[in-house]
């Protein structure tokens, strides 16, 4: 009759729990009578896992003629500590795996990779290739740039030579994103097992292969941990709404400018805090894989990670000579120029759907459609955008390396007739023992001559 029905028994039962819940979820009062307002209430004790819990409610009065006798209710349980531990734990494994891979490959290659930087830096194009190769091997553009600053401070490289290597480092760092964009999580545990067993070898090269395989497994295992936790959070409406503040999806045909700047700023801050653009890219890929961000938002985020990674070189150059400071400045200017170029391309539409031309290009050369209602192969699109973005900036600036060096010298000039301080025993060269040893011998000779 449309009026509240009091004293009607309603039964509540737990239909499903969040996947992986270890503690038992339960209904406090399985059967409850409705009150004067026709409302039946009970409390649900959720498990320890973040995720969806489904509760069924059934009216136990078939003779009353209610139009609806049962209704399932979906509840989202949130374990803050569990989420933080899982995401940070996954990120830690990811970064450690990345470092282990780099260390393993360096063991296999010996000191040859680091000697490449000094040997091939004489030609701009070859210097870019050397920077790309070394960074792809050691899995860190920051480490390459810090090493370059060490070479400059020790008088082993000039500013013009170092700029080519820095350009290449930005391309080499995209290899990590390319690797993790493939769905190889099923190989993580076998790789960890096999890699660990191989590391037990007493032979350096074989042990290096073991570290490489073990690092590969840890990298994907950490990525899977982050992705799985973020996918569950993606079901939580309030959590998804938080990402709308920097959603860069076009409004009236244009990407919202403030949202784009906000996403780039978040990329900068995240990379500065983590001290690794590759790790920050891993988070971007995990967010995209969980459906929390789209292609429009991911690209400004990755542009921000490129700017944030320059902080490491800046810190390393504080105690170095003026030329090393100019190299750190070159790294920063290169990445800022790339960000400004990409910001401009965001507002150059192409095609009937007025998609930004760079995003349109990436979507055309990558399998799947990143702009579909349900984005396809989104992680691969983001990795390809990261790689081609850095390649494009290098192609634009490579013919102007000398002019770029002149700009750095104009911003941070060396006083006339002022000698450039050379530090033979440069601490940043310790990661390349053979070169550090040569510098030590050189320093001893200078001491003897003096």
Question: Predicted segment positions?
Answer:
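Hydrophobic core segments of alpha-helical transmembrane domains in multi-pass membrane transport
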Residues: 86-99, 131-135, 192-201, 215-226, ...
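The feature marks long extracellular or luminal low-complexity segments
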Residues: 1-79
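Alpha-helical transmembrane segments of multi-pass membrane proteins, especially transporters
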Residues: 111, 115, 119, 123, ...
């Amino acid at each position: 009759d449309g009026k509240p029905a009091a004293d009607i028994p309603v039964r509540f039962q737990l239909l499903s729990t969040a996947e992986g819940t270890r503690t038992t979820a339960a209904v406090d009062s399985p059967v409850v009578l409705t009150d004067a307002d026709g409302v039946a209430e009970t409390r649900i004790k959720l498990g320890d896992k973040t995720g969806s819990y489904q509760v069924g409610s059934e009216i136990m009065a078939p003779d009353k003629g209610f139009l609806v006798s049962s209704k399932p209710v979906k509840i989202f349980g949130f374990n803050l500590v569990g989420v933080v531990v899982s995401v940070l734990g996954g990120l830690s494994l990811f970064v450690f795996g990345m470092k282990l891979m780099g260390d393993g490959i360096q063991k296999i290659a010996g000191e040859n990779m680091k000697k490449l930087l000094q040997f091939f830096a004489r030609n701009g194009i070859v210097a870019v290739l050397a920077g790309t190769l070394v960074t792809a091997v050691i899995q860190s553009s920051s480490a390459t740039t810090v090493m370059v600053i060490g070479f400059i401070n020790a008088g082993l490289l000039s500013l013009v030579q170092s700029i080519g290597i820095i350009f290449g480092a930005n391309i080499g760092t995209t290899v990590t994103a390319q690797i993790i964009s493939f769905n190889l999580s099923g190989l993580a545990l076998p790789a960890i097992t096999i890699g660990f067993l191989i590391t037990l070898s007493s032979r350096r090269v074989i042990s290096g292969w073991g570290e490489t395989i073990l690092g590969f497994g840890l990298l994907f295992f950490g990525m899977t941990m982050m992705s799985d936790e973020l996918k569950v959070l993606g079901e939580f409406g309030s959590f998804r709404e938080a990402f709308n503040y920097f959603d860069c999806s076009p409004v009236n045909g244009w990407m919202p400018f403030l949202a784009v700047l906000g996403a780039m700023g978040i990329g900068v801050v995240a990379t500065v805090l983590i001290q690794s653009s590759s790790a920050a890219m891993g988070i971007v890929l995990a967010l995209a894989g969980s459906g929390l961000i789209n292609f429009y938002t991911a690209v400004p985020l990755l542009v921000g990670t490129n700017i944030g990674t320059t902080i490491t070189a800046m810190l390393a150059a504080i105690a170095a000579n003026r030329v090393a400071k100019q190299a750190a400045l070159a790294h920063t200017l290169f990445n800022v120029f790339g960000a400004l170029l990409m910001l401009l391309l965001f507002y150059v539409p192409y095609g009937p759907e007025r998609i930004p031309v760079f995003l349109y290009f990436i979507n055309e050369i990558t399998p799947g459609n990143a702009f579909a209602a349900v984005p396809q192969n989104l992680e691969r699109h983001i990795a390809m955008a990261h790689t081609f973005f850095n390649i494009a900036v290098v192609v634009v600036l490579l013919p102007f390396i000398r002019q770029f060096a002149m700009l750095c010298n104009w911003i941070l000039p060396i006083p006339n007739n002022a000698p450039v301080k050379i530090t033979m025993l440069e601490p940043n060269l310790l990661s390349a023992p053979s070169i550090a040893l040569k510098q030590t011998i050189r320093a001893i000779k200078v001491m003897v001559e003096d």
